[in-house]
Every structure is written in C-alpha cells, then in structure tokens.
A protein has these predicted regions:
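An N-terminal, globular interaction/scaffold subdomain
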Residues: 2-21
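Long, hydrophobic alpha/beta structural blocks
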Residues: 60-159, 177, 181-186
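Short, low-order "capping/linker" segments at domain edges
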Residues: 37-58, 292-310
C-alpha cells in the first residue's frame, strides 16, 4: 500500500492495516509504503529501463533531518523533454524503492529533476541510503514511528477575538503539517480525500481564560493532557488518531483525524461536561465550515461562528 508521498493518506493506510481482518491477513502481508530493495530497477513496457546506478544525486541539507535532492539521469533526458511528468514519476518512484518510501517522506523535503548535471561532485542514487546513514539518520520503514514524529511551530497571533478559529494560535505541535497548512490556506483537498473515505480531520476548541486564572501555563497543558488521555485509551484510539495541539491567545486546540466522528464527539462531549470549561466546540479543518457545540455557556448562548452542522 503506497501513500504516494501523501502524509494524510498514510494515516488512513496505517489505520486500514491495523484493522485488516484475520481472513485477509491469512493470505496477505500488508505493508505500508514502498519497501527498500537493493539493486532495484524500473522497466517500462515501451523500453525505458533505469536503476540506481543510472541516476546522479546531489544532496543538500535544508535543516535538521531535512534534505533537498537534485537528480540527473542522462538515460531519461528524451522522456524529460517530451513527458516531463512521467520522468519525474520514474525518478521519485525509483528513489522510494532504493531508499524506502517512509524514509523518503521523512527526510527528503524537496526533489528536483535536472536537465543537465551540476558542476559539484555527485554520487549515485544507489548510494543514497548509505549517505543518509552517514548523517546519523535512522532509515526505518515503520510508518507509525514516522507518524508519531512531531514538529513544533510558532505563529503571529491575530488579536481579534472574532477572527476565524486558530488564527489566535501562538505555538503548537503537529505530526500532520498538511492539515494545518490546508486549513490556514483554505485548501480543502486533504479534507475532500478524507471525506471520500469516511474520515474527518478537525480539532476540539475551548477557551483558556478560566485556565489562566492561576499563574503559569501548566494548568493549560494539564487540561490538554487530560483531554488527550480520553483518546489514547484502547476505546479512544479506535475512534480517532491525535495529530497535535496548539495554544492561542484565547483558545486551546487539540487536533485529530476521526474514523468514527459521532463517537469521537460523544466522548469529547462527556469529557467537557465534567469540567469547569464554560464552552467547547468541534470544527473541521475545512475553514469555512460551521462548528459543532460540545458544551454551551450556562446562559444557553453559543460562541461565535457556531452552528449545529458538521
């Protein structure tokens, strides 16, 4: 099962893998992500044939555990000029199979195909795994280990309390950057793909003012931990997968992909009703969508932007 480099799709494939029936597993060994194969080559029906020894690679470090690849393959130059997309597919797929798709997704953040070689020294694609190991990287093909790697981020918060949800965020962490970026850019492609498969990505949102009444921020983090604990139980992890959280000027956020959204909302509703938090909502990562109230103000009023629809 290949996510084709799509991290959101990878969450779905891992969930599918873990829930495959015994009957299926008797006949199939389900692996997620293209597996590394030494001396692998790609051959097409119309005569194209390349291996890791046919591709020159230039590796550039972009940040911690983040690299850019530039690839040059003389054998594919005619294809690159006439069918550029196909040439890219062959080279990225070959890289998946030389390196392993999970390490490729984890460490290679930029991939460029060159029409002529660079002047700087290069190495062969077949040597890429060893070159990355020399950088101290672990080339694990375990998709769950990759999905559990979190990235911290900071934002310039909007002071307007009536701005869209999450625009007040100062800092957060996520193991699924595409969902955060998609929401902020009002890009619904990932949401559409999840929706087509019966899954929903979104976040719980609740006010922080009552938690801030005591000095320090520890109470804020303790509350988020308690909410997340509801969904790290066996029952909770069946209905959703946590993907991060954030702290804003006004609200706290807990992010997730839900496999059973109705049960996830029921569990969250029960949690919030047992707390002193005055209100809480669920909102999808579809920015223009309405919100679902999980707990309402004592006077029955709803918070800004709320409605009763998913």
């Amino acid at each position: 099962l290949t996510p084709e480099g799509d991290k959101v799709k990878l969450f779905e494939l891992v969930y599918f893998q873990k829930h495959a029936s015994k009957e299926v597993l008797e006949h199939w060994n389900i692996l997620v992500g293209r597996q590394p194969l030494p001396n692998i080559g790609l051959r097409t029906e119309d005569g194209w044939n390349i291996s890791g020894d046919d591709v020159q690679i230039w590796l550039e470090e972009q940040g911690e555990n983040s690299f850019a690849i530039s690839a040059y393959c003389e054998k594919l130059l005619p294809m690159l000029r006439e069918e550029e997309g196909r040439a890219w597919w062959m080279l990225t797929t070959l890289t998946d199979q030389v390196l392993g798709e999970i390490p490729h997704m984890r460490y290679i953040d930029s991939f460029d195909v060159l029409e002529e070689p660079k002047a700087e020294p290069s190495f062969l694609l077949s040597q890429l795994p060893d070159k990355l190991r020399e950088q101290g990287l672990e080339l694990s093909t375990d998709p769950e280990a990759y999905l559990e790697s979190y990235l911290g981020y900071k934002m310039e918060p909007k002071q307007d309390p009536d701005a869209d949800w999450r625009l007040d965020v100062m800092a957060g962490s996520t193991c699924c950057v595409p969902l955060i970026n998609g929401y902020l850019n009002a890009d619904n492609d990932f949401m559409d793909d999840l929706h087509a498969d019966g899954a929903v990505a979104g976040f719980f949102c609740y006010p922080l003012d009552t938690l801030r009444e005591e000095e320090g921020s520890q109470k804020i983090f303790d509350f988020r931990d308690k909410l997340e604990e509801v969904f790290t139980t066996d029952e909770g992890s069946e209905v959703l997968t946590l993907t991060g959280g954030a702290t804003g000027l006004y609200c706290g956020y807990v992010d997730f992909i839900a496999w059973d959204i109705q049960e996830a909302l029921n569990m969250a509703k029960e949690f919030f009703e047992g707390t002193d938090i005055p209100w809480a909502i669920f909102h999808t990562f579809r920015r223009e969508a309405g919100s679902v109230p999980l707990k309402q103000q004592d006077d029955g009023t709803e918070t800004e932007n709320q409605d009763d629809e998913l």
